[in-house]
Curated annotation (Swiss-Prot):
Keywords: Sporulation. One of its GO terms (biological process) is sporulation resulting in formation of a cellular spore. It is found in: Spore wall. SMART domains: LysM (SM00257). Residues 343-386 form the LysM domain. This is Spore protein YkvP. InterPro entries: DUF3880 (IPR024542), LysM_dom (IPR018392), LysM_dom_sf (IPR036779), YkvP/CgeB_Glyco_trans-like (IPR055259). PROSITE patterns: LYSM (PS51782). SUPFAM superfamilies: LysM domain, UDP-Glycosyltransferase/glycogen phosphorylase. PANTHER family: LYSM DOMAIN-CONTAINING GPI-ANCHORED PROTEIN 2, MEMBRANE-BOUND LYTIC MUREIN TRANSGLYCOSYLASE D. Its main location: other. The gene is ykvP. GO terms for molecular function: lytic endotransglycosylase activity.
Amino acid sequence: MKILFLESHPMWLYGLPNGFREAGHTVMISGPVSRENITEMIDEFKPDLIVSMGWTPEHSREKQAWIRNATKKVNIPLVYWATEDPLHTQNFTIPLIKKMKPDFVFTVTPSLCKTYESMGIKAAHLDFAFHESIHHQIKPLAKYSCDIAVVANAYPNFLEEHPEVFRSSSLKTLIRPLIRKGIRIDFWGRNWEKMSKYIGREIPRNWIHGYLDYTEAYKVYSSAKIIIGLQNCESQLTQRTYEILGSGGFLLTSDTPAVRGKFKPGRDLIVSSSPKETLEKVKYYLNHDSERKKIQINGKKAVKNDSYRHRAERMLEVLKSRGIIRNLGETIHYVDVLKEKYVIHHVTPGETLSIIASKYNVSLQQLMELNHFKSDQIYAGQIIKIREKLFRNINNKLF
């Protein structure tokens, strides 16, 4: 099958699209979406299935309308994977579904399937996973070696607006007791310097390492003795749960029904339900290397069937059984397809269409016609076609 992913965010590009590719399907990744290039991608690639997922720059209300209009003109199923559920179901997922009108919705929250079905949208559960080419075990690296690590953004503003969310409880159980006791945690992620209100004291600046690229996280998971993994909900698992275990990390997480439903605490990972338990288990496992390493091995085994290839296969099984699609490939980026036929330009911050036209010695009108623009408004990251490439025939003549 040919699957078109309307996505540009690295966190999602390395997951489900690669899962489909490894399952033998041909995948095109759109990159930044525009009103014009959606139609061109569909016309040139001729996908059997179109997938959108998450909450990224490709999900502005304007782009939702573009996607809906382009996909409804063709008889190709549009699927949306709601990865922001349940925290943003009301303020994001449901408005998106009403605007974009997908043919099927997958959600990471099982209980929401009935909600979407009641709206007249076919739905099913699809959990997070990990991709083995990104999250795999390596030998510990000195740069990331430490006793305890957290790889996550802090989200202080979200916690301020939503103090009732389970993430707040997870934070108070797993992180706050250690910080208050002066036990070092090394943090990778944004805004941990703003968390004193929720932790009870300032985190020392030399414990905070800032943003870590998504593709580098496995190095921390493989190098730290203990990885603390916060949970956002009691009824479902975070994506990092799978990624940490897939990378061979030793995971300390919240004691929730979802964790116990999937894993066996003390065998695959360790859990805590109180600050006291957190302190006790951290002290114990930092001093019992052999037990810790045994749990690491078991944790990796526990997610062997939770790769994104498994999720891709599951998605297709559901779509076939629900009548959305009928009964081996490579990953293709739309920009590479364009390069075969056109001279292209990636818009950088501050550039205007007039500046680009002057740079390539073409008229503004030519650029607007070639790219089907109705105005000269462009944005950083956009791919602009400049002109068709010239080719030589067998008589060495340009055509």
